[in-house]
Regions:
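Short active-site segment of divalent metal-dependent hydrolases/proteases
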Residues: 129, 133-134
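An acidic/histidine-cluster motif and surrounding catalytic segment
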Residues: 1-124, 135-188
């Protein structure tokens, strides 16, 4: 398992105006809905497109959408935070293949999208891109890391047809770092 702050992952983009490569790596995707309220927003092809845009290597990713209770339990257990958060990234490998679980808390995502005045689709796309970048070693604990990660997210989301998420009314919503994860055997 790799901590989210690792820096040896080669960047695909150097700044927010960089072009996004058109060739996208293979993705093995599993979608789980413990909370199905936004299932219609998270169609398999959309989720795969959003994740592939952010990936620099082949990947095996599980996306799990949970309710407040499970989101709180996971954030408390793995980050020591007594609240549910929007996205948790559990990265198990990032080279040569990315292996990760992304956990999205539907009630938190819904509240944030409403507070930011953005669509659920745009916010989910942002959080999935954000989580995929964490799975590849990006982090935002330090200002320079945050600037690099935000520039990458912005470029990718604009390439996908979404607005800059950091220009919205509630700039810098708390994003969950992915520094801890449970041990897991590799899927093969």
């Amino acid at each position: 398992m790799r901590a989210s702050g690792a820096s040896e992952v080669a960047p695909r983009l150097t700044n927010a105006t960089a072009t996004v490569p058109t060739a996208q790596p293979p993705l093995q995707l599993s979608l789980q809905f413990a909370d199905a309220r936004h299932r219609s927003v998270l169609g398999r092809s959309k989720v795969a497109r959003w994740l592939r845009a952010a990936l620099a290597a082949p990947a095996s990713i599980t996306v799990r959408v949970v309710g407040e209770e499970e989101g709180l339990a996971l954030n408390t257990q793995w980050r020591g935070q007594d609240h549910a958060t929007n996205v948790l990234t559990f990265a198990y490998a990032s080279q040569p293949e990315v292996e990760a679980d992304l956990v999205l808390c539907a009630p938190v995502v819904e509240r944030e999208a409403e507070a930011q005045g953005t669509s659920l689709e745009a916010h989910y796309a942002h959080l999935l891109v954000h989580g995929a970048l964490h799975a590849q070693g990006f982090d935002h604990e330090k200002p320079a890391q945050a600037q690099r990660m935000e520039a990458r997210e912005t470029a990718l989301l604009m390439h996908l047809g979404f607005a800059d998420p950091y220009s919205l009314s509630l700039r810098r919503q708390s994003m969950a770092p992915a520094s801890s994860a449970p041990p897991r055997s590799r899927r093969r």
